[in-house]
Amino acid sequence: MKTMKVTQIKSGAHRLKSHKACLMGLGLRRIGHTVEVEDTPSTRGMVNRINYMVKVEEA
């Protein structure tokens, strides 16, 4: 299955609870942290919701 690399580039502090939940759901903990996740509709939805806080690369 396809994967994508997601890197957190902005802090999760003082954000909406749903946006913090998306960060936790993707496994992102701090600025500069990168995770590799499967490219599924659910992960795409989380990434789209917090697109201003993350950078996405196709892996």
From Swiss-Prot:
> GTP-binding: is it a keyword of this entry?
no
What keywords is this UniProt entry annotated with?
Answer: Ribonucleoprotein, Ribosomal protein
Q: Which GO terms describe its molecular function?
A: structural constituent of ribosome
Q: Which GO terms describe its cellular component?
A: cytosolic large ribosomal subunit
InterPro entries recorded: Ribo_uL30_ferredoxin-like_sf (IPR036919), Ribosomal_uL30_bac-type (IPR005996), Ribosomal_uL30_ferredoxin-like (IPR016082)
Cystine bridges? none
* Signal peptide location: none
Please give a single GO biological process term from the UniProt record.
translation
- Looking at the keywords, is Ribonucleoprotein present? yes
Q: Which domain of life is it from?
A: Bacteria
The protein's matches in PANTHER family, at most eight in alphabetical order, are given as: LARGE RIBOSOMAL SUBUNIT PROTEIN UL30M, MITOCHONDRIAL RIBOSOMAL PROTEIN L30
Q: Which family does it belong to?
A: Belongs to the universal ribosomal protein uL30 family.
Q: How does it assemble?
A: Part of the 50S ribosomal subunit.
**NCBIfam families the record matches:** rpmD_bact (TIGR01308)
Descriptive protein name: Large ribosomal subunit protein uL30
Organism the protein comes from:
Psychrobacter sp. (strain PRwf-1)
Designated gene of the protein = rpmD
